[in-house]
Amino acid sequence: MIRLRLLAVTLGFFASGTVFAADLPRAKPEEVGMSSERLARIGEVLKADIAAGRIPGAVIAIARHGKLVALDAHGWRDKAAGVAMTTDTIFNIASMTKPMVTVGALMLYERGQLLIGDPLSKYFPKFSNMKVAARDANGEPTAETVPAVRQITIQDLMRHTSGIIYGGRGNTLVHKMYPAGSGDASREYDGAAFVDKLASLPLLYQPATVWDYGFGLDLLGLTIEKISGQALGQYLKASLFTPLGMNDTGFAISPDQAARYARPLPNDPDTGKPQARSPELTQPLKFECGGGCAASTASDYLRFAMMLMNQGRSGEARLLGPRTVAYMLSDQLGPNIKNLIGNADPTRADYGFGLGLAVRTTPGVVKMMGSIGQFSWPGASGTDWWADPKEELAVVYMSAAPGPLRWHYRQVINALVYQAIVD
């Protein structure tokens, strides 16, 4: 059944994201070990780049020691239409959907309804006897296949070790067989057809041997639907979004939310080529993809980040047990799985990977600052977030700025936030 992203307002669900600023305690930067003068550099850099036409606008939300330090909007929500950015602007968060879907699955795990070691074929039998592309003398995949040595598991979906890939992230024979990405696939296939398509394709790698980016979280979302008997968005709304007060987060965009939706610049600032103007608002989703089809606000997503940093608790509500969160945030790759995270996000090369997100395993080596245990995962449309439990720091940065520039701003925002910590 086709689900349109543009739906009628559901009574009581679509409250303004600015409510968050009222119910989270605020603090002056100096009260939580940060410098107002240094934090102001974020706005200075963003305003200069907005004026130079590099990005349309941005919203940044920062919390430290459980208190809101900054919730600021800069530039344009829709520059072409002359609409200014506001803190309740809604963004396509793309792969920032993945950690939320992982949390939704772990809730089923805590109820005994889903096991991390379950084979995917338990829920979708067509994945029972997968084939893997054979390699030629140069190590390149060929049209020949060999049997998978073991089943794909739920853990493989969560940590991107299933061998199932995104077609748009390579040029091999196998990549050309796969859909390009989550958004494209969700507009081309319904859930059943999507499962049939992926189950018919060879894996690029044997399961549990290589981290490579792909459709694992989309399949996890469909697994959640099968277990819960609900659409993914409906399940996450009841179990995650509503308990956290994430009232502007979901897969369905109301008319009110569409009016608050951030749009990219008409042309890519680097190449000058036209950019897609938010096709997710006009093209129907045939299934709610767990890999990248949600929208949210900076303040909503900050709630989610802080819940994980607070070991599964938000106020009086406990969404996950602390040991489940610790397991989610632990490195799931180890020494025997080849780590290609840097191919998906060069700024997170040398990170480890937990369940649904990257985890930092060293204070150095990586291109960005952060403590061991920092966790994150960005979105290809220009959004990013991270939480650093050691620093009690959570940051969400949102901009409608797809393309290679997003890697630049991930590093810029990281540097500008950490340099403002002075305690």
PLM ranges: what are they?
Residues 1-8:
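Bacterial N-terminal signal peptides that target proteins for export
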Residues 8-18:
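Bacterial N-terminal signal peptides
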Residues 22-93, 113-115, 129-137, 277, ...:
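Short, conserved catalytic-motif segment at the N-terminal edge
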Residues 25, 119-372:
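Short, surface-exposed loop or secondary-structure junction motifs
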Residues 35, 98, 297:
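Short, conserved phosphate/pyrophosphate- and ester-handling motifs at nucleotide-, phospho-/glycolipid
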Residues 40-47, 60, 66, 71, ...:
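Active-site SXXK
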Residues 75-77, 281, 401:
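A generic structural motif
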Residues 385-386, 392-401:
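Short, well-ordered beta-strand elements
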